[in-house]
């Protein structure tokens, strides 16, 4: 249906009847958007399976937050229109290069630590 294929932001509840988790995952993953999904279950195996298999930026299990994760780099996947992946601390790693420099002011030649020598 059309409501399955739209990325709706607002007070809208869509109820889609499915026969099992496999079908629910197919419906979820069959849309071109992937901001977030919610799952309500007491089955911890199903919860972790959902977090692994659902094709979206964030998976809520039993609604643990209010949905304002601006500090995280999830931003959604596929053609979702909300946010960027450059959120959270990971942005520093993405846009950074690490360099190392060693300075010796002793004025003497230093031998490698692996050298075995007698002086």
Name these PLM-found stretches:
Residues 1-119:
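Conserved C-terminal structural/oligomerization subdomain of aldehyde/semialdehyde dehydrogenase
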């Amino acid at each position: 249906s059309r409501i399955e294929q739209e990325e709706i932001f607002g007070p809208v509840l869509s109820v889609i009847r499915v026969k099992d988790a496999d079908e629910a995952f197919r419906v979820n993953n069959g849309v071109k958007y992937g901001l977030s999904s919610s799952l309500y279950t007491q089955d911890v195996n199903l919860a972790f399976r959902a977090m692994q298999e659902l094709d979206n930026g964030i998976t809520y299990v039993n609604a643990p937050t209010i949905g304002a994760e601006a500090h995280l780099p999830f931003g959604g996947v596929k053609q979702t229109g909300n946010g960027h992946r450059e959120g959270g601390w990971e942005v520093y790693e993405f846009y950074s290069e690490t360099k190392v420099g060693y300075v010796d002011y002793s004025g003497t030649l230093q031998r490698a630590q692996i050298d075995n020598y007698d002086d």
